[in-house]
Regions:
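Alpha-helical, largely C-terminal catalytic domains
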Residues: 1-187
Length: 187
């Protein structure tokens, strides 16, 4: 990628640093989309030994690019996002991706198709990490920031997507333990 094209792409991606998400950090700072994606990529890296048969570089790429559409639409929590919101985000993202030079445009287009269809183990792992990281972050945020429906959501979110992996099922159980401990402590 030429230097100017790289800078232009980074200027778009920088918007995610300002795009706040629904919850906060441990100290009450609003979480942003960039930090969510970064920690997802870190999770994938730390899981490399657990998934030796997978292309973990692909999973890390998926984690890094998965929310780029929110550069154009902002973050809408999953429990509020409508199909119209998803369609608008997909359209704006697709237009931007097509403006990138190859091989990035074609690589990202293929990755997004794979991610949307959950057509590979890598895509299933990325999606599991996406959901698990959100629950972990909620567990780390002050319970005073939780909405009433999140008490049950934190107990159940991502239990379906992790079923393909024994490791992820164990991780989800550990996260559930943290959720239940947090609720019991009221913090």
């Amino acid at each position: 990628m030429e230097a100017r094209q790289l800078l232009e792409a980074l200027h778009v991606a920088e918007r995610l640093k300002d795009e706040t998400r629904h919850c906060t950090t441990t100290k009450g700072t609003p979480e942003n989309v960039a930090s969510h994606s970064w920690r997802m990529a870190l999770m994938a890296y730390f899981m490399t030994d657990e998934f030796p048969e997978l292309d973990m570089n692909k999973v890390i790429k998926m984690c890094l690019i998965h929310d780029l559409g929110e550069c154009f639409t902002g973050d809408i929590p999953t429990f509020r996002k409508t199909q119209a919101d998803e369609d608008r985000e997909a359209s704006l993202l697709s237009n931007w991706v097509r403006s990138l030079p190859d091989p990035y445009a074609s690589d990202m287009t293929a990755l997004y198709a794979e991610m949307d269809a959950l057509s590979s183990q890598e895509a299933k792992l990325y999606k599991s990490i996406d959901k698990l990281e959100a629950v972990i972050q909620h567990n780390e945020s002050p319970i005073s920031t939780w909405e009433p429906h999140e008490y049950e959501l934190n107990r159940t979110y991502a239990t379906d997507i992790v079923q393909f992996s024994d490791y992820l099922k164990v991780l989800r159980a550990e996260i559930l333990k943290d959720t239940n401990d947090k609720i019991a402590a009221g913090k």
